[in-house]
């Protein structure tokens, strides 16, 4: 308005304008009310703000790479690095870049829009959605695709990934265009395209309108090693999650019967794909065919032989060897003292020595059971000290009633550990230490006994031979073992570890009794100070 007023004043008479009209117009424009209206209009006028840049986070990370080596040279640089690495500052930049890269205006209609397959589906106008996302080159979106009715459909969204955090896409959404170009129907090509794009990405989608399901808090302990890059069945190797035996994972999605989504509890980070219980059991249970080529067709046509085996209690260990363990559901518990400490190992690896040392050093905290026997007591033996003496008929009746954890016969007499004797020690507030046969773990691994299972592994044959020679020379034992006996111990130790590894909370190689005792003592103390992951059945 000020510019118009100045022009009116300087307007030459040659324009033909009447002077009275100019005076009238000038009077209106100088009126205070009109000036106020003009100022209000300027204030309310919508002026579009343009972002200077939509990749500030990427620029800041590049700056950090350049100046981080100088933090020890200049205090100001160190302070700046600290500010730029602040989580709040990084989140602010990320939020700015996301907002700056979004398209708030109506997007221009693409050339394909008029004749595309979208129109052929006779969908309502409001079914088509245009979304804008911002990403860096090489940054995974955390999403996989599948072909459905010749369309590319979102098969799964990885928990914790970029798409999951933004919440803009959902499972079942159909991807029609990326940056104005139709995507076709090849999932791998789309994955590569999205992986290499940087900056602003505009997606045209047909929403699925499915209800989102809140993920359950499910945690599992893994009983096998897994590397997605060695898996030929996984739909996208880059989306897989690598883990090792014994790690704890959080399962965040189990909708797919073959592929679950999980994340590391200890390391955190985005979720990845892991084989489901069903899929991995099928893989582990698969056995190559045994063919019988003894028929009359000289091997040109053959029939499959099926191995039949009836379950026998005497062959319990053989069936344990073929038991398939994949995942075990667990729960996190605050620190607590376990009811039992179970030492598993081959004969002669030092379990009894470790047990006796714990009880002698701390009898108020640790105890053990007194075994039962059907043999007659000797003259110097008292009932309840080394053994509890009962009649054979009574012991056989209790064994039949399932009152014994384990039992055996030696030189015509029965020996065994009664379940009630374990509970008697626990009821005194002490941890009951047991050195039992590994088959007993099936009974012990319950909330009633809450065991901490430690496998005492045999060392290498040379080390075991040297240890045995040392105890014989010191006069600790008079029993001489041959190389065959020692090798049998090593082989038995390896067999037990293969068959029962999934039960073990800790493995200690006993190549030095003092060091093995220290390791075991440290592990038991940790149980009283640190949270523990235990089977879910112990909690619920």
Curated annotation (Swiss-Prot):
Residues 215-284 form the SH3 domain. Abundant in testis, brain, and kidney with lower levels detectable in other tissues. Residues 1-48, 49-107 form the L27 domain. Residues 130-209 form the PDZ domain. PROSITE patterns: GUANYLATE_KINASE_1 (PS00856), GUANYLATE_KINASE_2 (PS50052), L27 (PS51022), PDZ (PS50106), SH3 (PS50002). It comes from the Eukaryota. Residues 338-525 form the Guanylate kinase-like domain. It is a peripheral membrane protein. Its main location: membrane. Transmembrane segments: none annotated. The modification Phosphotyrosine is found at residue 500. GO terms for cellular component: cell-cell junction; extracellular exosome; membrane; plasma membrane. One of its GO terms (biological process) is protein-containing complex assembly. Pfam families: Guanylate_kin (PF00625), L27 (PF02828), PDZ (PF00595), SH3_2 (PF07653). It is found in: Membrane. Keywords: Membrane, Phosphoprotein, Repeat, SH3 domain. Interacts with CADM1. Interacts with the LIN7 proteins. This is Protein PALS2. It comes from Homo sapiens (Human).
